[in-house]
Amino acid sequence: MFRQGSNSGNKRMTSGARLSQPIIPLSLPTASSKTLEMGRSSKTNPLNAMGLDHNIATSGGDPEYIMQLVNDVRKFSDVLLSLKEAFHSKESQECSQHVVNERLGELVHVLKAVIGKHQALNSSEILGAAGTVIAKVKGVNFKEVNNENKSTIFGEIHTSIDTLAFTFGNVVSDFLMGDVDGGSRLGYPQARRSRSFENLSEDSRGCSQNDLADHSLSPELSTVEQVDLLLLKNDSGVESALLYAKAWSKYTKDVLAWVEKRLSLDMECAKSFAKMAESAKAVASQQDFMPFRDIYVSAFKNEIEYNHVLLQTAAALQTNKFTQPLLARKNDLDKQRKEIKEQWQRELKKMNESESALKKARLLKMQKREEYEKARSSTSRTEEEQPAAGGRTLEKKRRVEEEALQKAEEAQEQYKACVADLEAKKVSLSNAKSEILAQIRKLVFQCDLTLKAVTVNWFQMQQAQTMPLSVNYQALSEQAKKYEPGQRYSEFVRSLPKERVWLESLSQDITASSKTGMSLHKRSQNSTRSSHGNLSQGSATSMDNHSADEVEGNMQPCKAKIAERRSNSSIDMQVPRTQGSQRAWSSGSAGGGGMCSDSESAGGSSESRSMDSPTASPGDFKRRLPRTPSTGTMSSADDLDEREPPSPSDTGLSEMVMETASSPGPFRNAQMSKAAHTHKLRKLRAPSKCRECDSLVVFHGAECEECSLACHKKCLETLAIQCGHKKLQGRLHLFGIDFAQVVKNSPDGIPFIIKKCTSEIESRALTIKGIYRVNGAKSRVEKLCQAFENGKDLVELSDLHPHDISNVLKLYLRQLPEPLILYRYYNDVIGLAKETQNMDKTDSAKEKSAGEQLGLSTELKRVLFKVRDLLRQLPAPHYKTLQFLITHLHRVSEQAEENKMTASNLGIIFGPTLIKPRHLEAEVSLSSLVDYPHQARMVELLIKHHQMIFDVPLSPMSPTSPTVSQASFGSSIQDKESKLSRHSRSLMDIKESAKLYKRHSSVIIPAQLMEEGKEMKTGDHRVQTSGEGSDVNGVGLTSVDSTSVFNRPGASSRMVQLRPQRAKPVSRPISMPIDRLLNERNSRNTVEHDHSPAAIEETTEPEKPTTPRHTNFYRNPFIDTQTLRRTWDRQYRHYDVTPRTAMIVANLPPSGVQKQPEISMASQSSTSRKDGTSQSGVAPISFRAARTLKPSSPGTFYRPPSGGQLKPSDLLAKSVSRAPTTTTGAIYTTAITVLTTASTSSVMTISTAVTTPPTTPTTSVTVALTSKPTFTTVSRSVSGGAGEGLSESDLLSPVTLSPPQSPGSSTEELSPTDAKPLYQRRSRRMQELEHREAHFV
């Protein structure tokens, strides 16, 4: 136990010695404590870490210092040796290069530490040798080193290393021997040595040897280095430098502001001075005999040239001579200053973190040391008290002591690491400070250089532009001194005409004054008259007291007096006559009230002097007083100031009158917009509110005489409200107002702001990229909104940007309290939009000529018709506005290739605006956000299919076109049947859908008859036409006899006068049930026909027929239709016929014909011959003659079959009368009578009466067929030109045509907008009314 205790004691003593060895010197004032003191003092000055401020006694008698020196020299020697050995390494080139760089960095670090610790070794020889080593090592390219040149390249490096070692040893030996004092050896200030340290560290990172030598060998300290050294010694040097850079930036900013303001004022003044000099030069150039005229003209020219130079100088200073370079330098300084400041703050933060870590480590070390001391003392007491017992307790305490010792050692190591880290951070901070100060210095020097350059430019250019001015002024002053008074006056007198001419003109003036007492002279035709009161009065009126004898006797004195008076009143002198050498003076007499005394001309006259004094001279024959403007009186001083003098180029009084009449008075010089030019402006007489900026106008305001619009003078440049030539109403609250209130003043139900904006966009902005997508400037948009509220529809938009206009339109629609598609229809619209999401979006909208669309799926069509029916429930203003807006958006989408605004993009923009839910809360609900794609989808559908939804025809018919092009029919039988099935749901759908095809129709023209045969085969429909079409634009009507199948004699039809047209069209009832029609067609398929279907057609009765009408017709009921017209009209008034064509068509296939399968027909148009001489016979829809229905044979109208009364076969008789196309303007009237018998068969007689001029031959063709009746009703409108037609069979179900030798089917001519909707069966009441009407006929 004792041995064990002894061993433990020895171990404890050894551990204690090991722990106390590094700790004790920390608390003792030994040499190592200097380092700690230096580290503590470096908190205030980071340069102390480098030893720059540490003054060490260089006495060689201090053995401790000498031992430190020896150790440092040995360490430096080891580093040199390791660097030298790195070049002999057999590793790869990359590894060797890496090792060499590490050894070189270690060498520089050790050398810097040694020189920092021993200031006496800061020698230029050592620094030069070290720089040579660094340069040699950095200059080696290890990739080029091989076995051949290895010895040569590395030999130079070895030599430089040996030189550094030899130099270092010599300096140390000299220092130890005391040959040279440490302070006097170098002879450099301490600051210079610190500069060498920096250069040495920089060279270790790649600086060249020459830079090192320059900095290290320079015997004197430059001003720049002194500045850097002072800032390095200062604790807040970086902050001071940054503050100076900031102050320099602010100073430069102030200088730039002054220069900009000065240059702008100089340019403004130069422009004004140049303008004044131009006008003065023009005036002075016309004065022929005025003194100093040439001098002043030269002065004006010099002034103009000087102002031009001033403008050029100002422009140069604003660009590359002053403003731009200085501003660029200032911006660069601000940017780099911020970066440097952030870098310095990061370094300071690292330093503070290291200091705080060191404090924590010191406290932890002290704490662990105390714990160890306690554990050690406790173990010692235990050993002393119980040396032979308590082994376990002793072992436990020994373990505690060992653990405390281990922790204390760890804390000590951590403290050492923190101290080393703090020292490294101090060195890094010192280096960063040096670099930052150098950067700031370079920046400041560059900024000063730029400021110096621009300042020199400024004063040089100022001196260059003012130098010629003083020289010119000196020359002009010398020239003015040479003038003799009266010189120009003498020249003027010598240039006057001879005495005889003066005697005649003067005697005429005196005679005229004595006889009439007026100042007007009687002049020749080529002289200018001064009958207007604005011309100047002559100054010879004072001569009225002289008689003619005095003038003749004393001519010379008189001439002298005249000259004197002219000189006194030269301001008011008028130009002499220019013909020959004669000159006459205009004078005024007392009787005329036009006299002007000398005192008035000298200074008493107001208007004539103020307006005419610049141009008054004996040679100025164009001087005139401008007339008083219509906007005010001449007594206003502002008017006199704002009026310009008359132009010297005016040559006549008429031109002056025209100018003054068209001038806008006091605002002639103001910059005005297009809208402002429409107003008749005058000065504002009372304070009012400006309609442009909506602020109060007190001074310098303008007011329109017609509409009373008030505006600032400066606002005239941007005024957007035109003059309405009537008093402008008050401000209208337009945005955010109920739609019903806005449309009250709109006759068509569309707000003016929508029409105004869309028309302007369509006129000049359809091809602008991103229209409606790109927003306008907020300030301009708000200004335009205010203009709309102030000026309503008088706002001028031609000067505004299209994006501002589109933004205002979107803003108006967005701010409506309730959108165009009302809230109550939101769910229905969103539901319909959702239905289209799963449909094929690749359905292309292929438009037919009649306005229908093909290629769309049935589901999509059904949804579109639902949308149409839903939108028709909107109020009329909402519906019209929505249709107008969607049509406009469709035009925008048509230019999508240029403006990139497709229907989908427009839907995204206008979807949430036109379709939005009612928000009960303030915020938008999540459901409404989810509905955004559906809203966009619905608007996209409205834009793409707006023709189907809003019943818009593709090309509305023009009633004034000279020829009517051939109509192309694009709906097949299957399409018509699908429409019938779609419309069979409600009678309202039937009536509404009929409006599409009744909107653009004109007069009713019967079918044109042709001889062509039609041939139909399975899978193919070919229409072959031959023969000539008859002219349908005739004036007279003739009757053609027809023969029925029973060989009855022909009877003429009597014209039946129909009721006048109603304003609102209604749909005509249909008798044929749709289900029966579909069932029969599905069962019977396609049958062949060799006849054309019969039809009832109504035509317009001509006002003045050229030929008498024939009344050959059968009257089966023998009732006079003329006497029953009123009763018939009254009973059938609900089914008033509009100017459309109604046909009841019976498809009667012949018996025994083999059935063929039904074939779906595509849209096809019949071929017809075109006659170039045909003209449109379309009559106006309203206010035309009543129409007539002319049956050609007795019988009744078709009555729907009931029960089994009808036989399987019916007999069809068709009489076709045709006239060849020989004239222009023929009108056809066709009457059809269908006989229906209940017992055996149905006999139908079709009589076509064609009225042509008497010279036109007519033909009659009769065809008899027997078949089962199949009827389809087609309502259509026909407007045509001769030579164009379409076979009726194209409008029916698929039929089989007869061979070519059978008579051709009748054709009709249709306009491009004709359409043929099919309708469902009418109710029984309608059938009874129709049957009753047939009996009346």
Curated annotation (Swiss-Prot):
Residues 1-20, 369-397, 513-551, 564-654, 960-983, 1016-1066, 1083-1114, 1149-1210, 1273-1337 are annotated as: Disordered. PROSITE patterns: F_BAR (PS51741), RHOGAP (PS50238), ZF_DAG_PE_1 (PS00479), ZF_DAG_PE_2 (PS50081). Residues 326-443 form a coiled coil. Residues 369-384, 974-983, 1083-1092, 1325-1337 have a biased composition (Basic and acidic residues). One of its GO terms (biological process) is signal transduction. It holds the Pfam family RhoGAP. GO terms for molecular function: GTPase activator activity; zinc ion binding. Residues 1-13, 525-545, 568-579, 960-973, 1161-1177, 1295-1310 have a biased composition (Polar residues). Residues 225-488 form the F-BAR domain. PANTHER family: RHO GTPASE-ACTIVATING PROTEIN 29 (PTHR15228:SF7), SPERMATHECAL PHYSIOLOGY VARIANT (PTHR15228). GTPase activator for the Rho-type GTPases by converting them to an inactive GDP-bound state. Has strong activity toward RHOA, and weaker activity toward RAC1 and CDC42. This is Rho GTPase-activating protein 29. The lineage of its organism: Eukaryota, Metazoa, Chordata, Craniata, Vertebrata. The gene is arhgap29.
